[in-house]
């Protein structure tokens, strides 16, 4: 083989490795709720299929009878704009501990990520759960949670990615941990779960278990809230951790085999391989500092509904604004009437 042939073969191999790294980083990243998930793809001339495809390869755009169109057949979607539901489960109860909606507008080159507080109030009469908190809908499976999110916010969910927290720990450990600026005093002990969280504000080196502890903390031993704004502060910390992890993943491409093993063992998604590959080109053009916007749905976390305490009642006006600004795939703006924001009267 001549020098030119060897050089071309080497370049092709390098490109395959690069794309594979971006793919793993993307899904691994979504491993706790975030952006790199965008690195999956289908085929350039084909659009990704919807959540109802059960990971089958689709060679054409979803039809107008697919779930994402059934919800609102009269509203037009932006071209090549897709929504993803990212979920991490609660280790003790099986409920969803982290719920995020990520929307990737591949034409505009923008990503919006919105966290839905786990205690967000929902109407039990809607049929997704008898308990009035959205995290409980995950007990019936990812499709049920997806339906609850669509019912709540009025937007379709095209794809899902669920993460096992053991995978998150393994991922952090595979890159040697992270250096993170702990935002608040953390002191919590739960012998039943063998959970002990003790950190002080400032730059701290965290291994996988430590990082998970920081992500999980809500209250301190003395009964005070870890964050003055409760779950808003907690999800803000989670988002910052994910960005930190994403950057370090990209700095360690030589660990690709470990990333693949972790993804295979701990991540579940309905993204087909072809869908995943389609997203690579638009994802490669993203600027992680400028093209990604994050927010947490605002509300009141002190609401009680029947026997459920500390429900998180969403602020209607602010919720509609955030959804329209960051994650709606529709051309025209949604209104409060398009959503199902339950409130205690």
Located regions from the model:
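Non-catalytic, solvent-exposed segments at the cell envelope interface
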Residues: 2-345
């Amino acid at each position: 083989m001549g020098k030119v042939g060897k050089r071309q073969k080497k370049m092709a191999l390098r490109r395959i490795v690069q794309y594979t790294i971006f793919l793993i980083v993307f899904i691994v990243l979504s491993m706790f709720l975030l952006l790199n998930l965008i690195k999956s793809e289908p085929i350039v001339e084909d659009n990704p299929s919807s959540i109802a495809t059960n990971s089958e390869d689709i060679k054409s755009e979803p039809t107008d009878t697919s779930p994402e169109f059934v919800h609102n057949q009269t509203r037009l979607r932006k071209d090549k704009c897709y929504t993803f539901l990212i979920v991490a489960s609660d280790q003790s109860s099986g409920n969803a501990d982290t719920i995020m909606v990520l929307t990737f507008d591949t034409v505009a080159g923008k990503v919006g990520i919105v966290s839905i507080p786990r205690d967000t109030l929902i109407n039990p009469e809607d049929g997704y759960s008898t308990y009035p908190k959205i995290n409980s809908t995950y007990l019936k499976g990812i499709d049920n949670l997806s339906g609850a999110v669509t019912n709540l916010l009025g937007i379709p969910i095209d794809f899902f990615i669920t993460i096992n927290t053991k995978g998150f720990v393994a991922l952090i450990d595979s890159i040697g941990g992270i250096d993170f600026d702990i935002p608040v005093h953390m002191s919590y002990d739960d012998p039943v779960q063998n959970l002990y969280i003790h950190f002080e504000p400032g730059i701290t080196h965290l291994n996988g278990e430590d990082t998970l502890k920081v992500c999980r903390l809500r209250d301190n031993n003395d009964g005070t809230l870890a964050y003055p704004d409760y779950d808003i502060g907690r999800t803000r910390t989670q988002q910052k951790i994910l960005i930190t992890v994403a950057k370090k993943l990209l700095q360690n491409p030589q660990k690709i085999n470990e990333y693949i093993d972790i993804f295979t063992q701990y991540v579940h998604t309905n993204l087909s391989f072809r869908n995943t590959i389609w997203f690579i080109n638009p994802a490669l053009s993203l600027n992680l500092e400028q093209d990604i916007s994050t927010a947490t749905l605002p509300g009141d976390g002190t609401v009680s509904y029947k026997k459920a305490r500390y429900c998180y009642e969403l602020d209607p006006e602010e919720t509609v604004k955030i959804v329209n600004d960051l994650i709606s795939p529709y051309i025209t703006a949604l209104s409060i009437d398009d959503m199902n924001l339950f409130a205690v009267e």
